[in-house]
Amino acid sequence: MKKKPLSAKIVFMKITEKILIVDFGGQYNQLIARRVRDLNVYSDIVPASKALDYIRENKPIGIIFTGGPNSVYEEKAPLPPKEIFNLNIPILGICYGMQAMAHCLGGKVEKSLKREFGKTLTKFDTGIPLFKNIKDKSSVWMSHVDCVSRLPEGFVSAAQTANTKNAAMANKEKKLYGIQFHAEVEHSEEGQNIIKNFLYNVCGAKGDWNMKSFLAEAIKDVQNTVKDGKVLLALSGGVDSSVLAALLNRAVGKNLTCIFVDHGLMRKNEGDEVEAAFRDTPMNFIRVNAESRFLGKLKGVSDPEKKRKIIGEEFIRVFEEEAEKIGTVDFLAQGTIYADVVESGTKGSAVIKSHHNVGGLPDHISFKSLIEPLKTLFKDEIRNLGTELGLPDYLVHRQPFPGPGLAIRIMGEITEEKLDILREADAIWRSELEHADIKKDLSQYFAVLTSTKTVGVMGDFRTYDYTLALRAVKTSDFMSADWVRIPYEVLDKVSSRIINEVKGINRIVYDITSKPPATIEWE
């Protein structure tokens, strides 16, 4: 099949209520979108340069200006178009977004005499719609070096801290509001209530965004895009690909072929579990045993980015070969989600690591177009969508698993021996956590086989075996995460079982690093 340039199909949801989030480069932009959607209102993130185009096409009921790393008085600092303030659309500016609003409307922004970072006690004017029914004093999350020293005409100060006289500003008549703190961060006690007030009290939202409405529109959009074409999907059995498979099966039925590429890098028994879950469904299910092929390509490779690239490219090669066998294939479907796109780097941000679904793909593939119906959804939304689709709980709520599989949970070169060791150790870790009464406090947990060997003693013999790292985190959005305080008795039991039951490991360590500064995965 002749290679054709990649052409991405963008799915536009026909949702009646939308909030435009104007992106000024802040680190919490996706979190703002998540918070808005949690309140049943759809949101889109758009650069400031495209804000007016978006407004003309989508008619949002409200606008949120994000934070950002710049100072508004600097040359080339990003600013909203001034026309945006004359459209009679409610606007909420967050941190830099508040400063940008003040600057554009004639206020004054300058460096703060005292910078504010972290939790800060704040006093609120609860008489304004934005702060209705919240506590008049509560802690918020501050992160700023500049402040609004003079308010624009028509605005009043709506919140104060010990060091900031204008911690929030309000123009009730024009429905323009600014907050110097980050309401979207969990550390802001009344943050979600403030966002809710903006959506419902200020913008007049009714709340029509949910997975039921998304599913209905997504099916229509996929059908309109695909028509009578054939769709090929890589089915890993993870949450994302499983939900996507169910959605596409609902949309195009027999025109969907799901290829399960068993690259030999999966968790214990997972390959057979995936096949058992999907082989009897109406979709066309094909399992490809490609373990030796992948391990051959990965032989001698230790660099994690090279591993990801190799696995991504080999996945596509397998798809091309399978496509030749099954005939004409028009569309390649991918379970790309928001976090994949964010962590693979965008303009103006550093690349953290390439995701298998994004940076690991070659530039050209032998399909007409790429479709990514889940690209705008957060992980928890995808789980909710899976429930809406009727998928079994063990598929919807299974542990997140990266596309490259255990290849990025083994430090250094990948070998069959290391894979066998890690599978057994990881299975014990997951099993013990799932049987302990702490599962509700865990978002993701797994084992990592390090490349470090240490000296140990077992019986009368000296050992020189691998060190295993255990990881468990709690997160609501996977943009940030805290390590979980696992009870000592659980850690003790896990350590004892692994050392005694898994040959090749003689030392266990527990990862107590949050995200940031670390990522959840080790590679």
From Swiss-Prot:
Task: Supply the InterPro entries for this chain.
Answer: Asn_synthase, Class_I_gatase-like, GATASE, GMP_synth_C, GMP_synth_GATase, GMP_synthase, GMPS_ATP_PPase_dom, Rossmann-like_a/b/a_fold
Quote the EC number: 6.3.5.2
- Cite the binding residues for ATP: S236, G237, G238, V239, D240, S241, S242
Domain GMPS ATP-PPase: from-to ranges: 209-398
Catalyzed reactions per annotation: XMP + L-glutamine + ATP + H2O = GMP + L-glutamate + AMP + diphosphate + 2 H(+)
Q: Which GO terms describe its cellular component?
A: cytosol
Spell out the molecular function terms from Gene Ontology.
asparagine synthase (glutamine-hydrolyzing) activity; ATP binding; GMP synthase activity
Active site per UniProt: C95 (nucleophile), H182, E184
One GO BP annotation is:
asparagine biosynthetic process
Tell me which Gene3D superfamilies the record gives: 3.30.300.10, 3.40.50.880, HUPs
User: What keywords are assigned to this protein?
Assistant: ATP-binding, Glutamine amidotransferase, GMP biosynthesis, Ligase, Nucleotide-binding, Purine biosynthesis
- Ranges where the Glutamine amidotransferase type-1 domain occurs: 18-208
Describe which pathway this protein belongs to, using the record's wording.
Answer: Purine metabolism; GMP biosynthesis; GMP from XMP (L-Gln route): step 1/1
Alphabetized NCBIfam families for the sequence: guaA_Cterm, guaA_Nterm, PRK00074.1
Q: How does this chain assemble?
A: Homodimer.
Annotated HAMAP family: GMP_synthase
The record describes the protein's role as: Catalyzes the synthesis of GMP from XMP.
**Protein name as it appears in the record:** GMP synthase [glutamine-hydrolyzing]
| Natural source organism | Treponema denticola (strain ATCC 35405 / DSM 14222 / CIP 103919 / JCM 8153 / KCTC 15104)
